[in-house]
Amino acid sequence: VIRFIRRAMKRIASALAITALSAPLAAASDFLEPFEHIHLSKIGTPYVHSFGIEPAFTGRDLFIDHTYRVGDGVAEHESEIELEWAFTKQLGMIVEVPYVWEDEEGVATGSGFGDLAIVPRALLIDTDRFMLTGQMEVVLPTGSSRFGGETAIAPGVSMWNDLGNWWTLNSGLAIEHAFDEDSTELVYGVGLVKSFGKVSTDHCEENHDHDHHRHVHATAGLFHVHLEVTGATPLNGADKGDVNLEGLVGVSYGLAVGLDIRAGYLFPLTTPRDFDKGFTGGLIFHF
């Protein structure tokens, strides 16, 4: 009887140990699961990139954007190249490189590269209607003295919500600290997207794991309307507590397999204004 009890206890202990280890091992295996280029959720809702908010979903995409802002006789142009690269299904990185030039009353007053930003990120929650990604933006002082030369970090989160009927919401929240100026601010944004069109099955492959057509460039031909609000609030210094907001109304379109085009109108929502109006446009290449 004693031997039987001992054997039973050993088996129970082994079972408990396996159970305790299985959860973290399963989580680790999920992070190392191979990347799968998906543009639709498990229930068929399109994943759409907002203009000024990092996505919660992972991908392999190249963005080439140009933004123009004007106010008080000063015009600022910013061209930016951004690469989003997923290493696995849940781990990835974003790299951003801007180039800025200004003119006043039509006369060039300065130009140069902005700072390089590197953003390691991990998809932490992934459900049919909600995604949450944690990230750590690191800004390196690689830009010109006029438009860069700062070191900063910005830990934050990005979220994606499926609101139903092809309405989606991209949102983000981060705390950015600039070391050179010893300044800290809360950075935030929300982007509402309404998608129109029909998913083409010409470029889809069935994912048997979920029984949905979700593969690669299934969003070619879809049209999207964007409404966005982004902003920042200083957490220290003379401007502590001020709210600085800007809005965007834009559209994007799946021009071809692996290529989206987009454009938007920018406007300030709070005073004092940093600019009077602005325009942005660009291309998204999906790999």
Residue ranges and their predicted role:
Residues 1-35, 207-212:
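Cleavable N-terminal export/targeting peptides
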Residues 28-287:
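Transmembrane beta-barrel domains of Gram-negative outer membranes and organellar outer membranes
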